[in-house]
């Protein structure tokens, strides 16, 4: 095993029998040829299952919606990107020249996908039991800190429920501008609601975050109006 992969293996706590699987898990589609997309697909399903199973046993009285929101908070891209940075995965990615130049090794989406790729590769290399063991080890602190008391619906969900309860049309979100270099972009989104004459703007470093920020502002405005 190369010293580079030994270092990474120590960080993730697992040494691959088939190094080719690890190398494939680290290969972005921009590199050309075989890449980690199929492993990512597999890893995503395994991660969702392992976290769902743990939460099911950890919170025996939780409702389905509460468990779903807890799981979503743990498997979302932001959390996976945090894990990737803890492992310093950016140092090991195989990226195409353009992606490398634009800072792809720092991009949350690429880092998150790589974590899922490694999970898929680990499953193929050692099976479900070993894979589960390592996922739960990676997530131990986050799982131990999880509580039903802090489960909250995101702003878009709360806004949708607010409008549905009052029999109003659902909001519409439009990306109106994207500013910055590919590796450091700011998205501007307009949220349109029939109860508001003007659009509500939100911004963030991803479309999802911009939409959530717009929804939060819209909800605050509607609650002030006491619609």
UniProtKB/Swiss-Prot annotation:
Subcellular location: Cytoplasm
Domain RNase III as annotated: residue spans: 5-127
Catalytic reaction annotation: Endonucleolytic cleavage to 5'-phosphomonoester
InterPro entries assigned to the protein according to its UniProt record, in alphabetical order: dsRBD_dom, RNase_III, RNase_III_dom, RNase_III_sf
GO terms of molecular function: double-stranded RNA binding; metal ion binding; ribonuclease III activity; rRNA binding
A Pfam family this chain is assigned to: Ribonucleas_3_3
Key words, A-Z: Cytoplasm, Endonuclease, Hydrolase, Magnesium, Metal-binding, mRNA processing, Nuclease, RNA-binding, rRNA processing, rRNA-binding, tRNA processing
Predominant place of localization: cytoplasm
Alphabetical list of SUPFAM superfamilies matching this protein: dsRNA-binding domain-like, RNase III domain-like
Active site positions: 44, 116
CDD domains named among the record's database cross-references: DSRM_RNAse_III_family (cd10845), RIBOc (cd00593)
EC number from the UniProt entry: 3.1.26.3
Superkingdom as given in the UniProt entry: Bacteria
A single GO BP: regulation of gene expression
Role description: Digests double-stranded RNA. Involved in the processing of primary rRNA transcript to yield the immediate precursors to the large and small rRNAs (23S and 16S). Processes some mRNAs, and tRNAs when they are encoded in the rRNA operon. Processes pre-crRNA and tracrRNA of type II CRISPR loci if present in the organism.
NCBIfam families, A to Z: RNaseIII (TIGR02191)
Similarity remark: Belongs to the ribonuclease III family.
Subunit record text: Homodimer.
Protein name: Ribonuclease 3
Gene that this polypeptide is encoded by: rnc
